[in-house]
């Protein structure tokens, strides 16, 4: 985006955005106060298995999805069309595998760290190696999850990147540190609602700008962006029913089979059946985000089909068109830009808090307790877990 193209932020927008951060932080303070007499490691990492299943389902809808799904799916539809929607089939199949193949194994183990499985099956060294790779991978992933939305925020507002990143990361660290897994789950539930509200807002306002959603659909159809039945077996074809369904199935199965954040939540529930219900319950929220992102891509194409921002030099690549559309469509409506910015940053917050909680659990369970000279008390483990959250935050 050009340096001189920034979004006009009114005081109302700042208030809307700030409220998002304040509410997320307040969740941490609430659970820190409510559980002040239950300060133990089991409560911090698994909520004593007394977490609302619906909240866990909503939390899972966000914790597995990449933070940039909103921007990337919309850009994909803008460039290549709606075939991307077939990833929903892969999501369905991957969810089934997670609920009925992976979750029963890890739930019955009843361990905070999922990498205990590797020690039982293969020995101590493979467990340590897998845990180490997980730590490195997660730090890199959540760093990128923080960087990309904050970069879009800077491009739209002109606020320096480091300030946005520092504030967002500090908010995440605060509510994760104070409230543990309960705060993470309920904060993500709040962030999910903000994300849905923001996406509906840009979809509605964008549709109005092009003469209605069906007008946008008609324009996209004329320019061959509406496509659902590409059954080609040519491996050079970007998107086909088979490629998306099968490819996303393996990706999503990995999310349920080797993702500490996901399995930590599922194993924080009272029974295996509840855990399986939660895995299935995460599917509607995930599909809703993907569908709204796809529809936003259709509207985005209709809005810019006669003046492609990349060709005109307004942006460098298609991933920047979504933030540009916010600038063009919403800049004159106080409050709405703040909601969309909150939507983007909420997507980052959910990924970061999930990662911090998972990193803390793995560090303590796999690298501190096994090498401790004597058994650690609950109080010591809790203190070390919180230090691990702060340390992970500093690395990010």
List PLM regions with ranges:
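Membrane-embedded translocation segments of transport machinery
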Residues: 306-309, 315-353, 369-387
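Residue-level recognition of pore/gate-forming positions within transmembrane alpha-helices
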Residues: 21-24, 63-64, 91-95, 134-138, ...
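Membrane-interface "cap" regions at the ends of multi-pass membrane proteins
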Residues: 2-70
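Helix-loop-helix module between adjacent transmembrane segments
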Residues: 61-62, 85-177, 226, 247-255, ...
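Loop-to-transmembrane helix boundary motifs in multi-pass membrane proteins
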Residues: 121-128, 138-139, 162-165, 364-396
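Alpha-helical transmembrane segments of multipass membrane proteins
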Residues: 25, 29, 152, 170-177, ...
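Loop-to-helix junctions at membrane interfaces in multi-pass transport proteins
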Residues: 2-10, 46-55, 72-86, 119, ...
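Helix-loop junctions at the membrane interface of multi-pass solute transporters
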Residues: 31-34, 43-47, 61, 75-76, ...
């Amino acid at each position: 985006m050009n340096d001189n193209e920034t979004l006009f932020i009114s005081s109302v927008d700042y208030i809307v955005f700030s409220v998002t951060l304040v509410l997320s932080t307040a969740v941490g303070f609430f659970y820190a106060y409510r559980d002040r007499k239950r300060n133990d490691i089991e409560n911090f990492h698994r909520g004593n298995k007394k977490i609302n299943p619906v909240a866990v389902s909503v939390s899972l809808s966000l914790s597995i999805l990449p933070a940039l799904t909103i921007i990337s799916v919309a850009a994909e539809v803008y460039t290549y069309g709606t075939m991307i929607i077939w990833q929903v089939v892969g999501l369905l199949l991957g969810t089934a595998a997670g609920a009925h193949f992976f979750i029963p194994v890890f739930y019955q183990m009843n361990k905070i760290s999922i990498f205990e499985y590797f020690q039982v099956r293969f020995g101590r060294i493979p467990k340590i190696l897998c845990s180490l790779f997980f730590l490195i991978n997660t730090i890199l992933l959540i760093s990128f999850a923080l960087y990309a939305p904050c970069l879009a925020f800077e491009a739209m507002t002109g606020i320096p990147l480091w300030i946005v990143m520092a504030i967002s990361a500090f908010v995440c660290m605060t509510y994760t540190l104070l409230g543990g897994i309960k705060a993470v789950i309920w904060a993500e539930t709040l962030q999910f609602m903000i994300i849905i509200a923001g996406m509906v807002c840009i979809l509605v306002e964008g549709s109005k700008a092009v003469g209605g959603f069906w007008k946008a659909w008609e324009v996209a159809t004329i320019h061959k962006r509406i496509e659902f039945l590409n059954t080609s077996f040519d491996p050079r074809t970007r998107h086909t029913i088979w490629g998306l369904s099968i490819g996303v199935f393996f990706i999503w199965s990995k999310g349920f089979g080797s993702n500490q954040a996901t399995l930590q939540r599922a194993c924080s529930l009272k029974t295996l059946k509840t855990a399986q219900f939660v895995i299935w319950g995460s599917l509607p929220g995930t599909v809703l985000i993907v569908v709204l992102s796809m529809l936003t891509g259709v509207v985005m194409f209709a809005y810019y089909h006669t003046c492609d921002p990349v060709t005109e030099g307004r942006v460098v690549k298609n991933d920047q068109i979504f933030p540009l559309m916010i600038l063009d469509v919403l800049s004159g409506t106080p409050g709405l830009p703040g909601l969309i910015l909150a939507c983007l940053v909420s997507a980052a917050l959910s990924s970061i808090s999930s990662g911090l909680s998972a990193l803390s659990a793995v560090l303590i369970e796999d690298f501190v307790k096994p090498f401790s000279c004597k058994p650690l008390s609950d109080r010591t483990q809790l203190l070390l877990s919180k230090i691990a959250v702060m340390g992970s935050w500093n690395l990010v």
